[in-house]
Amino acid sequence: MSTFLRSFGAVVATTIVLASTSGAQAEKIRIAGNFSVEHSSSKAMEIFKTELSNLTGGKLTADIFPAMQLGGAKENVDQVRSGAVMGTWIGISYLSRTVPELEAVSLPFAFANREQAFKVIDSKVGNMLNAKLLEKGFVTLGYMELGSRNVTNNKRPLKSLEDFKGLKIRMQPNETHLASFRAIGASPTPMGIKEVYSAMQQGVLDGQENPFSIIATKRFNEVQKYLSDTGHFFDFIVVAASKKKFNSLSADNQTALRKAMAKAVAWQRSKAAEEDTASRDALVKSGMQFDPISANVRAQLKSATSGVVGDLKKKIGTEIIDAVLSELN
């Protein structure tokens, strides 16, 4: 065999080996969520996707499925459990039945503002919740802002404590949330987000409660008249991964994944306040009647729901709740 043919054969063989090795090393993960494409959390996941590929030189990439492409929040949690997807980004309430300790950051009227809320979740409180999630097979990758939740309804403006009486309000599957609305005399109903629009349109529900950004992206203004700024709960979005699938990644890829997600979470938090204000203004412009809650009524609502803290302590113990209250003080 000529020297040229031997050299050419060696180059071809080397190229094949390198291509095979590169292919074997490349991995792709899938992450699913129920937030619309327009929501800041979904945009943040696209930042994560780009950053992850850049950090790993394309050796670890991600496919992102927002807007319930792979099902709703419950289905996404089940998919993480089964290993069908690497992770999900969802409101923490959808994990609270698996990890009830998450309700410790769902206390009514607990946070004065988003800065205080993130001070708490970024403290030892977050570490304690992460440990509880890990026990159930979930690795926490970060907490984004879902935001202050506000009530909409079709019955009447909410200008007093009495105005909440008897309202059929859709809630998330979070027992602390449900108990809080029972305490103010409302009739809360847990329901998946997919059914809420039609339920309000048909009069099965009087209203619902969500951050302004969700009310806007779900177009609830089309079937709701009255908008308020109750801000009764501050809600987080947790990015949770399958412990088994996360641990199957190399140490370098785990580090890259966490670093990419940290950048995405920081970006989303920086945009959330702007998104919140813009969404509220858009809802009012669309024709909703906006009635701000007075300081006096807010104080009455807080007083009416104060017993929820004691009930939750009986359910999950005092340690995490006391840690939350300590950070708040």
PLM regions: where:
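Bacterial N-terminal signal peptides
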Residues: 9-19
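Sec/Tat signal peptide C-region and signal peptidase I cleavage site
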Residues: 18-26
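N-terminal secretory/targeting leader peptides
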Residues: 26-116, 124-125, 131-329
